[in-house]
Amino acid sequence: MNLEELVLKYALANAVKYGGKADVKAVMSKIMAEVPELRPKAREVKSMVEAVVARVNSMSLEEQLRLLRERWPETLEERRVEQKRPGIENLAELPNVKGGVVVRFAPNPDFVLHLGSARPAILNYAYRLKYGGKFILRFEDTDPRTKKPLVTSEINAYETIREDLKWLGIKWDEEYIQSMRMEIYYEHIKKLLEKGAAYVDLCRPEEWRKLRNAGRACPHREQSPEENLELWDRMLEGRFKEGEAVVRIKTDLSHPDPSVRDWVAFRIIDTSKTPHPLVGDKYIVWPTYNFAVSIDDHLMGITHVLRAQEHSVNTIKQSYIFKHFGWEQPVTIHFGRLKIEGASLSKSKLKALGVRYDDISLPTLAGLRNRGILPEAIWELILTVGVKPSDSTIALSNLFALNRKRIEPIANRYMYVADPIKLVFKSDRELLAKIPLHPSFRERGERIYKFGPGTIELFVPRQDIKPGAVVRLMELANVEIIAVENGVAHGRLHSVGIDEARKVGAPIIQWVYEPIEIHVVKPVAVGKKVEEIGLGESALEKVETGAYVQFMRYGFLKKVGPSAFVYVHD
């Protein structure tokens, strides 16, 4: 392959990846990485790259794709072998699979991903792993007014979504951002206007609703292509204000669902007032969800669409675009909503809570990650629910159970007292406690405590201390509580063995000796958490940040800093 062909290959690949426009710097980087000996001739190479990129950018996206498929199909094919995940083999078979699938996950970056949005991401990627093919990440961000992409000094939803997907172990083959593809949408609506499959509607919204509900045509429906193209140009020039003109797709005016009748494909959004975070006020005429999705699904070669049941009407609307262009529509599988018992997955409600998107009390993926939920647990949950047309309601306890079985073997045991009281008692003998780091993995070691004979001072849970009662100090001894005076509990050694404790029904309680102060942050409800300060074993100082532990008789936690822990679940 000569140099010009190599440049053409990378220019086409870059253009297809980014909506039809190649970038000189990106192509140069690819060339220099593959042929480093060309670096001394970078100036001459750049001139060639600029010329080829200009030629490629003058082509339509369809032409770019055709050339790439004809000459370098390997750039569009599966490029890596990935490990199958447990549970994928149990997924229901997809219809009409021909040697692989091309699927997409298409989030709106107006908020971060949560447990509900993890479902389409995981299911689509799981089928990509099951059959081979391609997984596309597509940001659907063409509504800068009502669903404005979330980009602030604190959060960039585009980046956060990418991070969440990487955390889930999802690797996308291609990425697209719809707001960067506006010229492509303009090109295609112009074709529909030319062939009389769409028209510019100047009716007032209330007038249109009356006509639509009556199944009658708008007076602008019969405009000639020339008239529509002129009105379209006026829309692009800013000659109309918001709400004064829209472009409609011709459908069936007698369709039983009024929303399907001549739905809006383009509308005017005054981006001088609500600028888009990526393209600012460059565009004022924006495609609706259904139009942009239809064009992209075709151009990106999507074979199967897996999405929520709530999109079933959108599938019908999009079918008209495919019919007008004579394209084959992807196979669409709808699944029910995923509901979390006692927790809302509504973006608006989560935003309204007023806490950071990655707060451990939220069911966002960032929040669950910070809380200590493992991505493998989320995968198992989603694959277990699978692709069902009916809604599924699960409790967070289901997710916690799946997470627990993964962290239980790696979480060493430690003692912690949330609301401590000092316990003082005397022993006439030496007491010995051997506490293993993990009862199932004795080889990890143990802590050995020796006390007495004499006065012994420990800290125990206040709620377990009642005068006259006997308590079993875990792995140590049985103590009878005599009195509580001035905030200190006093007792006497009752016995040592576990059998004696059972005979008197003594509860087993944790205790700490020469403790350190421990800070625990605990989620108590969606958007709410509490912080408690307790006492823990000094051995907790040696636990690495990020490690999981189990506080006995308390729950599983994740260390997030010196003496700081996050409560994961019980």
Curated annotation (Swiss-Prot):
What NCBIfam families does UniProt report for this protein, alphabetically?
A: gltX_arch, PRK04156.1
A single Gene Ontology MF term assigned here is: ATP binding
Q: Which family does it belong to?
A: Belongs to the class-I aminoacyl-tRNA synthetase family. Glutamate--tRNA ligase type 2 subfamily.
Q: Where in the cell is it found?
A: Cytoplasm
Q: What is this protein called?
A: Glutamate--tRNA ligase
> What biological processes does GO assign it?
amide biosynthetic process; glutamyl-tRNA aminoacylation
Q: Which organism is it from?
A: Pyrobaculum islandicum (strain DSM 4184 / JCM 9189 / GEO3)
- GO CC annotation: cytosol
Relate the protein's function as given in its record.
Catalyzes the attachment of glutamate to tRNA(Glu) in a two-step reaction: glutamate is first activated by ATP to form Glu-AMP and then transferred to the acceptor end of tRNA(Glu).
Q: State its Enzyme Commission number(s).
A: 6.1.1.17
Q: Which reaction does it catalyse?
A: tRNA(Glu) + L-glutamate + ATP = L-glutamyl-tRNA(Glu) + AMP + diphosphate
Motif 'HIGH' region, chain ranges: 107-117
Q: Which UniProt keywords apply?
A: Aminoacyl-tRNA synthetase, ATP-binding, Cytoplasm, Ligase, Nucleotide-binding, Protein biosynthesis
